[in-house]
């Protein structure tokens, strides 16, 4: 499946768990009009990702409960999925291609 934009993902009928997750992220982008409010600006999105990585790092280094670490990881995953929507990249295919390149 090639990369889809927000509207395509919102209209898409998911056929597996990955597509269901992507649709949920796209619906969040659509609900808050990220595309129309600079939320798809990659400089801004990368800054958010760095901030979330910092929060994950702090949770780990301060010995926070695993639930808090998991929440920060989920934030990062949602952001990465959103990056792929903003850039119209098929993240699942890119993931699979990368794993095949490193022979997994």
Language-model features: where?
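Extended low-complexity intrinsically disordered regions
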Residues: 1-63
């Amino acid at each position: 499946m090639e990369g889809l934009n927000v509207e395509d993902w919102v209209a898409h009928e998911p056929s597996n768990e990955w597509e269901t997750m992507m649709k949920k992220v796209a619906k969040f982008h659509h609900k808050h009009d990220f595309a129309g409010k600079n939320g798809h600006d990659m400089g801004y999105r990368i800054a958010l990702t760095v901030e979330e990585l910092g929060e994950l790092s702090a949770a780990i280094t301060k010995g926070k409960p695993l639930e808090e670490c998991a929440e920060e990881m989920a934030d990062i995953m949602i952001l990465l999925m959103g990056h792929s929507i903003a850039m119209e990249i098929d993240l699942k295919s890119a993931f699979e291609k990368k794993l095949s390149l490193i022979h997994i």
